[in-house]
Amino acid sequence: MTKTDVSGLSQLGAKVDLPQSPEEAVLERVPSGHGGTDFVVRFTAPEFTSLCPMTGQPDFAHIVIDYVPDGWLVESKSLKLFLHSFRNHGAFHEDCTIEIAKRLVSLLSPKWLRIGAYWYPRGGIPIDVFWQTGNPPEGVWLPDQGVPTYRGRG
């Protein structure tokens, strides 16, 4: 079993206040320890919250992030705090989704990353936002993101 060096982490195991904005949030990474092996890491945030930049009303999404590491893993507590920092952040659905993906790509330089953000309806229209860095590595198992298309009461 590989022992992961966590000595450089500032949030894991510490009491940390919730960042007031995504810009303040500190994303941290740890070495993957499995170089040469392609595998998929999935994070699911079924209760993601941000604010509408126009009305200040809350927006809710079910977000699924999949990535194939290339040396680095995102430290999950820092990711949780980063995602929670959007709770008081006003931005459109598309902006939130792409900002999350780009911050992770910048931090990790993964072989591949995709994000699916399934936003709950506002004004009667659900908005789903999808983005990925390119084609996934050949041979990796990519399960469906598992979020059904919004049907309302149909």
Swiss-Prot record:
Reactions performed catalytically = 7-aminomethyl-7-carbaguanine + 2 NADP(+) = 7-cyano-7-deazaguanine + 2 NADPH + 3 H(+)
Q: Which EC class, in a word? A: oxidoreductase
Residues reported in the UniProt entry to bind substrate: V74, E75, S76, H93, E94
Q: Where in the cell is it found?
A: Cytoplasm
Its Enzyme Commission number(s) read 1.7.1.13
Q: Which GO terms describe its molecular function?
A: preQ1 synthase activity
Which pathway does the database say it acts in?
A: tRNA modification; tRNA-queuosine biosynthesis
- Active-site residues, as the UniProt record annotates them: C52, D59
**A GO-annotated cellular component:** cytoplasm
Cited function: Catalyzes the NADPH-dependent reduction of 7-cyano-7-deazaguanine (preQ0) to 7-aminomethyl-7-deazaguanine (preQ1).
* Name of the protein in its database record: NADPH-dependent 7-cyano-7-deazaguanine reductase
